[in-house]
């Protein structure tokens, strides 16, 4: 049951951003940009994995993620909660516990043979699976996990993340074209607003990050090394 006292979507976004800032998960550096897995530079980087070491914040955000999924998708919409290797595993376990559902995880690469070679745990044909991850940038890695789940004969039409970059306009369309709805707690825009409110970084840095968020590809082209 969702208690009436649960915060609104907007309040969840603000509180999530505040908590991520509090634990030092948010990193801004416009002078020495971070290099993403794609090889492109970024003045912002977030480490949601740090959440597992902060039990009070971790518990609150998992409550938020669970209620967000239930509000958006329904109370009886799933039969199995799957985490993506490796960052999604602890969060999937915590959500599964709250929803009283079985938990599995999806490997990045197959182990063994057969259509369940990428699945650890018990996943059955026909089950409705929610994929849980820490974050998503362009949605690409989610589709790989979704495909692995569907190969078992289960269905997967929803993915839930703590953090969504929300700077690449094609992300939700890419997921939607594959029949996947995205649920999330907060975005870079929420973090930027909260960081400004807290004066967590100097205004030069915040303005530089804002320029990146408004046009990431142009910023990356100008700052490519």
Swiss-Prot record:
E.C. number(s) listed in UniProt: 2.4.2.10
Cofactor(s) demanded: Mg(2+)
Enzyme class at the top of the EC tree: transferase
GO biological process, one term: 'de novo' UMP biosynthetic process
Stored Gene3D superfamilies: 3.40.50.2020
Record's keyword terms, sorted: Glycosyltransferase, Magnesium, Pyrimidine biosynthesis, Transferase
SUPFAM superfamilies membership: PRTase-like (SSF53271)
Keyword Ribonucleoprotein listed: no
Residues reported to bind orotate: 137
UniProt: 5-phospho-alpha-D-ribose 1-diphosphate binding residues: 107-108, 111, 133-141
Pathway(s) per entry: Pyrimidine metabolism; UMP biosynthesis via de novo pathway; UMP from orotate: step 1/2
Family of this protein: Belongs to the purine/pyrimidine phosphoribosyltransferase family. PyrE subfamily.
Function field: Catalyzes the transfer of a ribosyl phosphate group from 5-phosphoribose 1-diphosphate to orotate, leading to the formation of orotidine monophosphate (OMP).
Quaternary structure and interacting proteins, as annotated: Homodimer.
Name of this protein: Orotate phosphoribosyltransferase
Annotated organism of origin: Ruegeria pomeroyi (strain ATCC 700808 / DSM 15171 / DSS-3)
